[in-house]
From Swiss-Prot:
<feature type="repeat" description="WD 3">
    <location>
        <begin position="307"/>
        <end position="348"/>
    </location>
</feature>
<feature type="repeat" description="WD 4">
    <location>
        <begin position="577"/>
        <end position="622"/>
    </location>
</feature>
<keyword id="KW-0648">Protein biosynthesis</keyword>
<dbReference type="InterPro" id="IPR013979">
    <property type="entry name" value="TIF_beta_prop-like"/>
</dbReference>
<keyword id="KW-0677">Repeat</keyword>
<dbReference type="GO" id="GO:0001732">
    <property type="term" value="P:formation of cytoplasmic translation initiation complex"/>
</dbReference>
<dbReference type="InterPro" id="IPR034363">
    <property type="entry name" value="eIF3B_RRM"/>
</dbReference>
<feature type="compositionally biased region" description="Acidic residues">
    <location>
        <begin position="11"/>
        <end position="21"/>
    </location>
</feature>
<dbReference type="GO" id="GO:0042802">
    <property type="term" value="F:identical protein binding"/>
</dbReference>
<dbReference type="GO" id="GO:0010494">
    <property type="term" value="C:cytoplasmic stress granule"/>
</dbReference>
<keyword id="KW-0963">Cytoplasm</keyword>
<comment type="similarity">
    <text>Belongs to the eIF-3 subunit B family.</text>
</comment>
<feature type="domain" description="RRM">
    <location>
        <begin position="40"/>
        <end position="126"/>
    </location>
</feature>
<dbReference type="InterPro" id="IPR035979">
    <property type="entry name" value="RBD_domain_sf"/>
</dbReference>
<keyword id="KW-0694">RNA-binding</keyword>
<feature type="region of interest" description="Disordered">
    <location>
        <begin position="1"/>
        <end position="21"/>
    </location>
</feature>
<comment type="subunit">
    <text>Component of the eukaryotic translation initiation factor 3 (eIF-3) complex.</text>
</comment>
Length: 744
């Protein structure tokens, strides 16, 4: 039976000592940890000057911004007032936690309060850390000026020490990176060989000045004769890098947003926290601006109905040819153009283009007929929206003038292809039939430099174009078409390769584009033009079934077919080759040599490289274990004027005689060296044999044996009957008849 209330002990009569009770374990478990120190305080600078009467209004206005990142109140804002009754233009603010104080520094620093005042927000502990007594020396100490040391010439490689005008290339295999001279048929000459030089891949800058190495901490640029580090850009976990055409600026991207800890960052600031892209000034090594990823729209969903994220578009920031502008596409709405080096938005606003799908800068400054001021140019395209047709446009920057537009109908997709001199723009338009069951391709070619930018249409193509490539510095192009739907299958679809060029016209004009020839029943999927034009390789890459390469000459010097008399080309297949498992094909910058390679990044079978000349003759083949990359070193644009280049072309035959003689002399000297080496080896062997014979003779004399080892045999043969016949029997079996009997 439970005790009644009357039987319970009276707590007032119960005698005990509170100090004897041990509740330390409960206190340790449940005690609320109060924030210590000044971590919850921030200092706000840049406030307007107020007096005691207007101070409450400013605090009330300020609270609206402060409450957007954390919890604070009117009593937590302390705004000192001076003896003259006016504020000191700063205030102390207390938040409820250090996390909110850090968030306030990130979100409110640099935010405009009004047109004349911009907030500067810092943690109070930072001010104490960097500004307390002893941190700054009161006495001025002049900086120590280091002794001048001359920097290395970053383009010294252009003066080949061998005097042969050789090109360099970088090869990445296993964990080693090598830079080498190309020696054609002979083994390449190593310049530098380093282990663990990069963590993912290497990349040349557009003019070959720098070699880029990728690291978890960021990007490093190397160059000069001694291959020392020239620059470093601290972007943690960087994945990709892109240079401006003139090597003035650099874009780095990481799929991980940047995180700036309390200890800070050597190059980036709190403003860069949470960003993925950083645009750098290469000369100073400083960041110009950072950007976050954009959420790319996607029309496809997974099995659970969630939208599938699209792959990142690279490069996301595209450079103008003169390095003065960089632009970014917000797909479906706008193009943002930024002025360099300040990275301010052009005219402080993005260019609104409804539905815009893609854009691309002209690779050179186009000199358009009838235009006095030459500006940069970019093209863009928009799909059909409602009853509005698809559209291709050309816009001039910085004026933002729309130079030319073209309406298109029944468009499924479009691709933009600039010619290297910006003389032409080809828009490859995939159109669907009314039933939307079949596709066909037309080529809309904008003649950019001609007055009014006329458009020529090549619509005689019945199949779908899967590849298109302009001739560099020329006006001819190659396309690859297929009648089948291209899918990721082991057996590639049958394709056709077609060549086009302008027809001849009087004067300096360029005629209409005409079809030269088509080669059917191919497996080709890639086009590689020589950087100097004229020669082109049509190949099959990334295939498990076919590895063909065909070398074509567009200006063959032989007899021209009658059907091509009115065309500006004489097409000839020079050679064919194959490289098992080929994944990459690279022309050297002079157009003399071609390297084909099979990278372990794609497959592990027969990795290595082949080297060909421009005619398709194989010069060298080298299997390389764990081969990853081969990249020719680019060359900067020539410093010769057009007149000087014309003079060189005029005397090219005379120069060729000198070069041919040098090649012959070098080949003869190489042959002579081989002969001398073999003769030296033979002389060494004959001398060794003579010494050994002397030693054997001495040993036989000491052993009492005849000097000639064959002397006993000769004596025995001499003592026998010379005329005695020797009978030799040989048994030969011959099959006379053969029968076959089946036994059941």
């Amino acid at each position: 039976m439970a005790p009644s209330f009357d039987h319970l002990p009276d707590p007032e009569e119960d005698e005990y000592d509170e100090e004897e009770l041990d509740i330390s374990d409960l206190r340790e478990r449940f005690e609320v940890q109060l924030e210590q120190g000044l971590d919850t305080f921030v200092v706000i600078d840049g406030l307007p000057e107020v007096n005691e009467d207007t101070k409450p209004k400013l605090i009330k206005f300020l609270l609206r911004k402060l409450d957007s990142v954390g919890q604070t109140k009117k009593d937590s804002i302390h705004m000192p007032i001076g003896p003259d009754g006016k504020s000191h233009k700063f205030a102390f603010v207390e938040y409820s936690s250090p996390v909110e104080a850090i968030a306030a520094c990130k979100a409110l620093d640099g935010v405009p309060l009004d047109k004349k005042h911009t907030l500067r927000v810092n943690k109070l502990t930072d001010i104490d850390r960097y500004g307390r007594e002893g941190r700054i020396d009161e006495n001025y100490t002049p900086p120590k000026i280091e002794e001048f040391t001359e920097k290395e010439h970053l383009r010294s490689w252009l003066a080949d020490p061998a005097g042969r005008g050789r090109d360099q290339f970088v090869m990445y295999k296993d964990d080693r990176v090598q830079v080498l001279w190309n020696n054609e048929k002979d083994a390449p000459e190593s310049i530098v060989d380093r282990q663990h030089w990069t963590e993912s891949f290497v990349q040349w800058s557009p003019q070959g000045t720098f070699l880029t190495s990728m690291h978890q901490q960021g990007v490093q640029l190397w160059g000069g004769p001694s291959w020392t580090r020239q620059k470093r850009f601290a972007h943690p976990f960087v994945n990709l890098v892109d240079f401006s055409p003139g090597e003035k600026y650099l874009t780095t991207w990481s799929n991980r947003p940047i995180t700036i800890g309390e200890e800070g960052h050597p190059a980036l600031s709190i403003d860069d926290d949470g960003k993925n892209y950083v645009i750098w000034d290469i000369e100073t090594g400083l960041p110009l601006r950072s950007f976050a990823n954009l959420d790319l729209p996607s029309n496809s969903v997974d099995a659970d109905g969630n939208p599938i994220k699209r792959k990142i578009q690279w490069p996301a920031f595209k450079w103008s040819s003169d390095d003065k502008y960089v632009a970014r596409l917000t797909q479906g709405s706008s193009i943002s153009v930024y002025e360099l080096p300040k990275m301010n938005l052009l005219d402080k606003t993005s260019i609104k283009i409804d539905g815009v799908m893609d854009f691309d800068w002209a690779p050179a400054t186009p000199h358009r007929e009838g235009v006095k001021t030459y500006e940069q140019l970019f093209c863009y395209w928009t799909p059909e929206i409602g009853s509005n047709p698809a559209k291709v446009g050309l816009m001039s920057i910085p004026s933002k003038e729309v130079v030319r537009t073209l309406n298109l109908f029944s468009v499924t997709d479009a691709k933009l292809h600039w010619q290297s001199d910006a003389s032409y723009l080809c828009v490859k338009v995939d159109r669907h039939s009314k039933s939307k069951k079949s596709l066909a391709t037309s080529l809309e070619i904008f003649r950019v430099k001609e007055k009014g930018v006329p458009v020529e249409v090549v619509d005689s193509i019945k199949d779908t174009v899967i590849n298109f490539a302009w001739e560099p510095k020329g006006d001819r192009f190659v396309i690859i078409t297929t009648a089948e739907v291209v899918a990721a299958t082991a057996v590639p679809p049958k394709t056709s390769v077609s060549f086009y060029c302008p027809e001849k016209v009087k004067g300096n004009g360029v005629g209409n584009f005409k079809h030269i020839r088509t080669y059917d029943k191919k497996n080709s999927n890639a086009i590689y033009w020589s950087p100097k034009g004229r020669f082109v390789i049509v190949a099959t890459v990334h295939s498990q079934q076919s590895f063909d390469m065909e070398f074509y000459d567009m200006d063959f010097e032989g007899e021209k077919p009658e059907s091509d008399k009115d065309l500006t080309a004489n097409l000839q297949l020079m050679n064919t080759a194959d490289h098992y498992g080929v994944t990459d094909i690279d022309w050297d910058p002079t157009g003399r040599f071609v390297a084909t390679s099979a990278s372990i990044w794609k497959h592990t079978m027969e990795n290595g490289y082949h080297l060909y000349d421009f005619k398709g003759e194989q010069l060298r083949e080298e299997p390389v274990e764990k081969f990853k990359q081969w990249l020719w070193r680019p060359r900067p644009p020539t410093l010769l004027s057009k007149e000087e280049q014309k003079q060189i072309r005029k005397n090219l035959r005379e120069y060729s005689k000198v070069f041919d003689q040098e090649d012959a002399d070098r080949g003869a000297s190489a042959d002579l060296a081989v002969v001398e080496h073999r003769r030296r080896l033979l002389d060494e062997w004959l001398a060794w044999r003579a010494n050994m014979e002397e030693d054997v003779k001495a040993d036989r004399e000491d052993a009492g044996l005849p000097l000639d080892p064959l002397e006993p045999l000769k004596s025995k043969m001499a003592s026998g009957d010379e005329g005695q016949a020797i009978e030799i029997e040989e048994i030969v079996e011959e099959i006379v008849e053969e029968t076959e009997e089946i036994i059941s």
